[in-house]
């Protein structure tokens, strides 16, 4: 029987460190529930000591998730660990993940500690975490640049203190696959009590090696991989969950282990994370990119038509891709709508959410004669993009634009439940709409990114707009979808403004 490879998802913690990817409490819970449906083993929900908002988000995930272990991150400090323990108190299965830096440069320049002091802090942290849960994980930050002798000493000490999992992070993505594999082999051989703990890896993608390093470590005995949906993460990102899982599943001839992940949930969860964070998935992204299973070459197309396995090493349907087919129309009922959402891996938690989504579906069906799966996913995502405690809502928009003339936009916004109106000229319909919104909110933000993607084909297709705003060093993403591209643009802008003008303050550490 093959070993189990534990999948530890840190989209809600490390993934959220991507500039502009901040999530509200409700959005975190929605993603956590999707990860639970995917049968992810461990969900790292956040860093509870960072802020009251993050504490409440971890607490909400702990209350909502029953099948997966919920994890909270904590530095090797008593206050951090206590806060994590409090946030996880109602979890069905809880883990505290504590860490301290072990590389010479970090110990000297950042911690200003001697190695023996670092070891002492690590042991105390693990023992304190064990007061809250038996499931404790320890990470030596920047392990990839740490001295092997000290790394062995500290791992041996924390395992003896009660750590069930020891995680080896390549914090700055510096290692190459064979180097990282050798590091894991060496640690497992030289740490005398290594058989008492699961070895885990957490790889960053600065050199494009995160997935390769993770898989090399698995081949060397690691039995937990820390990763994120779509590879989301700070700088160049983290190891992509979908790539790690499908590499192990597809190459069972080479790997001595497998995961419990329900791979049919990969694409729906990828789209959910993309919609909530505003980070689009590149078309050529493995597994979840729009072109991942597209064949342009005539020879390839001919081969696939004759036998799919000639050029496809996995099935698109297996990972959650569905044919671009007409499925519903304006005469479709509520039960058919609910059933199709479930087939797409979309679960609405309450009847109120279902009713609201169904109403939006009916409105869309009046505009479009053909409704595709992609339309439904965009519709549900768009319905859930509202920021927590949303203060601004787009009530009405009218734009007049003629050839050779300046566009004029008139906007009505609900600001703290009070309707406010404004009009403004612009160099085009979108510019005019944004200026009208700005004249109401006086936002003084900088537009860093504006992009439009067609959700489906056809002249009546929905457009999905992504914007990225910057204000006082903060960055926020927003998304909106509509058959009217100007309306989609205004929705995305208001969505981003809700996030950037009233953000949740966080101060995450990096592991």
Swiss-Prot record:
CDD domains: DRE_TIM_IPMS. Belongs to the alpha-IPM synthase/homocitrate synthase family. LeuA type 1 subfamily. The keyword Amino-acid biosynthesis applies. The keyword Transferase applies. The gene is leuA. This is 2-isopropylmalate synthase. Keywords: Amino-acid biosynthesis, Branched-chain amino acid biosynthesis, Cytoplasm, Leucine biosynthesis, Manganese, Metal-binding, Transferase. It is found in: Cytoplasm. It comes from the Bacteria. Residues 393-511 are annotated as: Regulatory domain. Its cofactor is Mn(2+). It catalyses: 3-methyl-2-oxobutanoate + acetyl-CoA + H2O = (2S)-2-isopropylmalate + CoA + H(+). Mn(2+) binds at residues 14, 202, 204, 238. PROSITE patterns: AIPM_HOMOCIT_SYNTH_1, AIPM_HOMOCIT_SYNTH_2, PYR_CT. Pathway: Amino-acid biosynthesis; L-leucine biosynthesis; L-leucine from 3-methyl-2-oxobutanoate: step 1/4. Homodimer. Catalyzes the condensation of the acetyl group of acetyl-CoA with 3-methyl-2-oxobutanoate (2-ketoisovalerate) to form 3-carboxy-3-hydroxy-4-methylpentanoate (2-isopropylmalate).
